[in-house]
Structure formats: structure tokens, C-alpha cells
């Protein structure tokens, strides 16, 4: 299995910029980068009714889709756990 490319939706980039602390932003970025080598890490969940996956990073949730044929991960949303699924 090769390394996946990561594409981050523009709205997800804005959500990342809005994360309150620099340390949280750094950890979220590291978590997203780790998805390139392991798109389904321990602790990730497939969301029911959608072709999306979720990983937790502290109080934040990263929602993304995986296109195995293209070796592509598309980050859809980065949000605080209280508002991630709305």
C-alpha cells in the first residue's frame, strides 16, 4: 500500500485556522499528515449513512473521506466535538 495524498477542503482550512490554540492546530495537522500512511488508524470510526470517517484529536474531530482507487484522503471538516456532526 502506497502513501495517500491529502486534500483539505477550503472550509476545513478555515475551521483549522479558527482552532483556539496553536498547540491544538499543530496536533491536528500532525494527525492529518499521519493519515497519509494509515488512512484507517486505530480509533477511527466510519460514520453511519455516509462515506465519511472520523478521527479524534483532543476536543476536535476530523471528518474525511477515503478514495482508495486514487490513494486520496479528502478532509471535509475540522470541528470541536460539540459541533462536528451538525
Locate the predicted segments by residue.
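Enriched for short, Lys/Arg-rich terminal
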Residues: 1-29, 57, 65-86
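A short, surface-exposed loop/turn module that caps and links secondary-structure elements
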Residues: 30-55, 83-85
Amino acid at each position: 500500500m502506497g502513501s495517500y495524498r491529502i486534500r483539505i477542503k477550503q472550509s476545513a482550512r478555515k475551521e483549522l485556522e479558527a482552532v483556539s490554540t496553536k498547540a491544538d492546530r499543530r496536533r491536528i495537522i500532525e494527525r492529518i499528515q499521519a493519515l497519509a500512511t494509515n488512512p484507517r488508524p486505530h480509533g477511527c470510526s466510519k460514520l453511519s449513512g455516509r462515506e465519511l470517517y472520523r478521527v479524534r484529536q483532543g476536543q476536535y474531530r476530523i471528518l474525511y473521506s477515503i478514495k482508495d482507487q486514487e490513494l486520496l484522503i479528502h478532509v471535509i471538516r475540522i470541528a470541536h466535538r460539540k459541533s462536528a456532526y451538525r
